[in-house]
């Protein structure tokens, strides 16, 4: 940029205005005066009264204004903390706040590593956050913590390393002039996490002006130093552009078409819980789109290439953010692909491109390597040469055996894969089950859209949306990037929606090569550990990969679930919720608890259920299931192609015993889809092409049905002999006007096409079957389902 001419308003008294001119570098007089002219107009306008100055009295009131920070209970529930409870006005050890021998009446007591989201009051006069921080005197040993105050895209202030006994360090953070609506208070451990009792004290909002920026202008990433086609880290430049968007209150971020590289070193280190993943303390976020409103990111067909263990994209605490025409990939994919060159009854010989997939052989075992990481092998998936289909009847192949280098790129594995039907030319995807980071996270966001966004790789879910409202994905999807020669994409689900509400729309996208579902929609329920009194429950996050995120907030309704039967037991309103640690919570409700609630039951959020439209997508060549839905709001699955998804194409689930993923389906329409040779392998809950499989411990005790109102109509099934429909605890189930064309491309299961376990009001009619046949009750397997509950026609 030619010259850097910046002005800051230092003082306003009546009509006197002083500007500080900083950093005037060599530039022509012409350029200098052209810039100064616009500022001269602003000054003249102020003097002329176009921008009225404050009166001295008004100015004095504004300068002296202070608002004590009232930390909402929701911020404590949203806090990620490595251990223990976050406390208001108390230390981590539940004593008074004290730093460097000085006592403080107000603040937050936490334990590093932690990150506290702090919303800014909706007041245009709030300009700064002031406060102090340090290690609490009550810690039993010498801790070491670095405190940071962050916006949604950059570190605004850092304390440096602090230790017990040091005086509190003060900070003053510009807020309004940066367009900030959320701040993030992070305490990060330095040496280890021993005695890292971290206090934030004397927090106050200072009210000295409005500091509002212009609205809606275009921000060009190139003006902030983003350069395509070089291997330099583009993260800092992009984050500076995002900060500019926030300052001006929204607008368009324009990224010139090109290839851009991102590394952990230039990422914004944040700490928060992500549903259905491992829980690393730090998520290095390369593209943080946090605390934004009314922002459109135009990628113009660019490719973002990421290196190392990072979160590529984050949309958090934002509203009306759209990302358009962008591709996301890792330079080193998270799985390693090996091409089979020879098989026999004892060994399998493969070739691995070591440049694309770095590895070492240690103690005759694989050690796969990437930037900043090493991992072993746990299992593999086998993909067929030419078609890219997962090879039939292979499912997950567990192995971590003897590896012998043969020279060049060839290796011999002590592994008989011939017996699995694997042939030379097929591809083995060598993997494990680690899920450190998703490819894209949407968290506490409203009205988010991805348009023609392609996610090519991820170690966990490609897209994870949690605690958010209204999401739209159109075009793009999760697919192999052309030219890479790969067959796999996401390490788990392509898209995953946990505890969301409003509407989810996913349409015209391609999903292929992922290690789990194309889409998975569910709530998370917590296990009831103890009924403390008539209004209070102790609850627990029950799966180690689904902990810590805010399932309930005060004012929201919870629904009780009978643990053994999954039957609903009424609702209540949350009065208070205290997170004791990342896995345990104490909930107090306004109304008396139902007398039937007891330990072993579960609770879910009755205010966070989404409707779903999954329409005109292609799902192919993936592990496990094509799609999974668990929500009582309307679900429409229409016009999709499910092509060789190796498990069920569609699963309706629900449980309170494993993942604790709940949300009984009350209206599901499955129509105008095409199903081609699904169920070539078997996985959990995949009992038919369409499998309705809630996990009910005591099905015979149920008085009601878990799922209801499922309509399956006008679909085409091109399939070998496998069950078409399996259902447990479902009422009002219709399979009508479908076309089923059988083939012999794979070995059939030899089972009945319809299987029902404690179901009611089933209608099967007007279906066309080739070769021709007429279905009768003989084609149904019935368990705890009276025969008069199944009708054919009428």
From Swiss-Prot:
Its EC number is 3.2.1.n1, 3.2.1.n2, 3.2.1.22. The gene is glaB. It catalyses: Hydrolysis of terminal, non-reducing branched (1->3)-alpha-D-galactosidic residues, producing free D-galactose; Hydrolysis of terminal, non-reducing linear (1->3)-alpha-D-galactosidic residues, producing free D-galactose; Hydrolysis of terminal, non-reducing alpha-D-galactose residues in alpha-D-galactosides, including galactose oligosaccharides, galactomannans and galactolipids. PbH1 repeats lie at residues 468-499, 609-631, 632-654, 665-686, 707-728. One of its GO terms (molecular function) is alpha-galactosidase activity. Gene3D superfamilies: NPCBM/NEW2 domain, Single-stranded right-handed beta-helix, Pectin lyase-like. It comes from the Bacteria. The keyword Signal applies. Residues 1-57 form the signal peptide. Belongs to the glycosyl hydrolase 110 family. B subfamily. This is Alpha-1,3-galactosidase B. Keywords: Glycosidase, Hydrolase, Repeat, Signal. Alpha-galactosidase. Removes both branched alpha-1,3-linked galactose residues of blood group B antigens and linear alpha-1,3-linked galactose structures. The keyword Translocase does not apply.
